[in-house]
Amino acid sequence: MCDARMYTSQIEALKDIAECQVGYIGGVDNTANIARQVRDQAPENFALVGLSMGGIVAMEIVRQAPERVTRRALMDTNPKAEIDEVKAARQPQIEAAQAGQLEQLLREVMVLRYFTSHQPHLNWMICVLIWH
């Protein structure tokens, strides 16, 4: 869902002025290790953009190696620890995705959470992200 495909348009628009990379955040079990993994994939010095969970990872990268980050943009994120209610709600979603029910999860949970009648252009963008 929120992987490199989400940033295709931005990467294309910036290709003449910047080398853009989307860090891989899978395969590790905590924010510090995710940040280390992304940092290890990055050039020696780099600008950093983080959206939501990516912003949390970006803040950890800055904590670990501030001298490597030339500038940063953090969007729709916060520095606070996840509250227990959010953690509890996420676990059934993780289990559903692992059980091969990702499409059902997207239809029943994510679409309802992110679709809006007030901004129909966002609905189209979300559909493109979900179904491609």
Language-model features, listed with the residues they occupy:
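Alpha-helical elements of Rossmann-like donor-binding domains used by nucleotide-donor carbohydrate transfer enzymes
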Residues: 6-9, 13, 33-37, 41, ...
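Short, well-ordered coil/turn elements that cap or connect secondary structure elements
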Residues: 15-17, 43, 67
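Conserved alpha/beta-hydrolase catalytic His-Asp/Glu region
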Residues: 82-88, 100-132
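Conserved HGGG/HGGXW glycine-rich cap/lid loop of the alpha/beta-hydrolase fold
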Residues: 1-32, 36-37, 47
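Conserved hydrolase catalytic core segment
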Residues: 45-86
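Short, glycine/serine-rich, charged loops/turns that create anion-binding
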Residues: 1-2, 79, 119
